[in-house]
């Protein structure tokens, strides 16, 4: 038990253009060295690109992408009798969104397109269509949990 009281998690304010907390959290994940202006500019340009290419509302496309990327199960290492077991556990809702955002940004950065706006928009569109590296990461995480299902009774 910690000696100090837990600090309350800071509330994320919705972004000014789309009025969405999820978009605001994506801006925070994109941000490097505290440059929020640069991060939001990249995101809004990526959303404009999504709007022009798909003709749909970019926030809806992004929410669909998040649904396809967020994991339901993951594995956690648990030491029992001198050996480590990968124990499958359910992912809490807050962690699901955090992992989804993290994977979308991480795999967008690894893409080969020229600009970050292009990489991010393509990754979001791919994720919304059920393809892309971030969706593959979710599938791999689920496969890992399924493969270690035998150790589910070690859950704590």
Swiss-Prot record:
UniProt keyword RNA-binding, yes or no: yes
Record-linked Gene3D superfamilies: Ribosomal protein S7 domain
GO cellular component annotations of the record: small ribosomal subunit
Source domain of life: Bacteria
Keyword flag Transit peptide: no
GO BP field: translation
Keywords noted in UniProt: Ribonucleoprotein, Ribosomal protein, RNA-binding, rRNA-binding, tRNA-binding
Any one GO molecular-function label of the UniProt entry: structural constituent of ribosome
Record function comment: One of the primary rRNA binding proteins, it binds directly to 16S rRNA where it nucleates assembly of the head domain of the 30S subunit. Is located at the subunit interface close to the decoding center, probably blocks exit of the E-site tRNA.
Subunit composition and interactions: Part of the 30S ribosomal subunit. Contacts proteins S9 and S11.
Family assignment from sequence similarity: Belongs to the universal ribosomal protein uS7 family.
Name of protein: Small ribosomal subunit protein uS7
